[in-house]
UniProtKB/Swiss-Prot annotation:
Family: Belongs to the WhiA family.
Organism: Geobacillus sp. (strain WCH70)
Transmembrane segments: none
Protein name: Probable cell division protein WhiA
Alphabetized Pfam families for the sequence: HTH_WhiA, LAGLIDADG_WhiA, WhiA_N
Cell cycle listed as a keyword: yes
DNA-binding region: 276-310
Keywords from the UniProt entry: Cell cycle, Cell division, DNA-binding
HAMAP family, sorted: HTH_type_WhiA (MF_01420)
Molecular function as annotated in GO: DNA binding
Biological role stated in the UniProt entry: Involved in cell division and chromosome segregation.
Source taxon at top rank: Bacteria
Length: 320
């Protein structure tokens, strides 16, 4: 089962307050409901491939309203032959949709979230929970980038949902148009954690945070290793260049032509090619020399080698 499916399964088992039932149900029916007319009466079909969500809708309807509800199961005939669960509302559908602030008296759609549904903070949380159950998805934090989104068919509802997430819960949600609708999405791991907490998915939140901590630690270790590897490669490259320059000087004018301080460093570098500058400074006779001091002398040796290659005269009095 995917991380998103596990999250939704957890949400369908939550208890809901009487004041919050309407908010969650409104989101579920608004986003997954299909309105039709049969024998001069309104029918509402709510379709989902998730049995737990279908059961949740059925339970909320039975708990909050005196409407006639049927639960049907169909088999998809194309591609994946999954079950499709249909919660069908027959009698009292119009009054129900008016009460849920989805339809007006004249049967026109209300495409924004009604303030009456989300007066309390707990009801705001419940509406977001219903919206996530109806059209939400969240990436597995182990295998991909952090991403949570909720799909809406209508732009007005999508903007209203984004406003609810940002103005009341400061989630920094953003909107985007897709081919068949619109999405409100989160990209920041911290905001996704906050959203899971808001809608009551506490087990999913704990798992998300555990994975996130391990992932962040792994990334930190990788960055550190990459940094150390880069530094090591830089150090090795510098040492090889120094040895090559010292050999060139030895083959052209001889190391004995160098000033004593430079000759000593050149000879030590040839003898100890794999030691660090700090370790090289500890090998100098007559007292320890700092890393910067050793680096200064090796740069002078590099300059001498480059001048010799270019056929330019070398002034050894300026080499220290």
């Amino acid at each position: 089962m995917s991380f998103a499916s596990e999250t939704k399964k957890e949400l369908t088992n939550l208890e809901v307050k009487p004041c919050c039932l309407k908010a969650e149900l409104s989101a579920l029916l608004r986003m997954n409901g299909l309105l039709s007319f049969s024998n001069q009466q309104i029918l509402v079909d709510v379709q989902t491939e998730n049995a737990a969500i279908a059961r949740r809708i059925y339970t909320l309807l039975k708990k909050g309203y005196t409407v006639t509800v049927e639960l049907l199961v169909r088999k998809k005939m194309r591609l994946k032959k999954n079950n499709v669960y249909i919660v069908r509302i027959i009698d009292g559908a119009h009054e129900l949709l008016k009460d849920l602030k989805i339809l007006k008296e004249d049967f026109s759609l209300i495409r924004v979230i009604s303030p009456e549904l989300v007066k309390k903070k707990c009801c705001k949380r419940s509406y977001l929970r219903g919206a996530f159950l109806a059209g939400g998805s969240v990436n597995n934090p182990e295998t991909s980038s952090y991403h949570l989104e909720i799909f809406s068919l209508y732009e007005e509802h999508n903007n209203s949902l984004c406003e609810l997430m940002n103005s009341h819960f400061f989630l920094n949600a953003k909107t985007l148009e897709r081919k068949k609708g619109f999405i409100t999405y989160l990209k920041e791991a911290e905001k996704i954690s906050e959203f899971l907490n808001i809608i009551g998915a506490h087990q999913a939140l704990l798992r998300f945070e555990d994975i996130r901590i391990v992932r962040d630690m792994r990334n930190s270790v990788n960055r550190l290793v990459n940094c150390e590897t880069a530094n090591l490669n830089k150090t090795i490259g510098a040492a090889l260049r120094q040895v090559e320059n010292i050999r060139y000087i030895d083959e052209t004018i001889g190391l004995s032509a160098l000033p004593d301080k430079l000759r000593e460093i050149a000879e030590l570098r040839m003898m100890y090619q794999d030691v660090t500058l700090k370790e090289l400074g500890e090998l100098v006779s007559g007292g320890k020399i700092s890393k910067s001091g050793i680096n200064h002398r090796l740069r002078k040796i590099d300059e001498i080698a480059e001048r010799l290659r270019a056929g330019k005269p070398v002034d050894f009095h300026k080499s220290l």
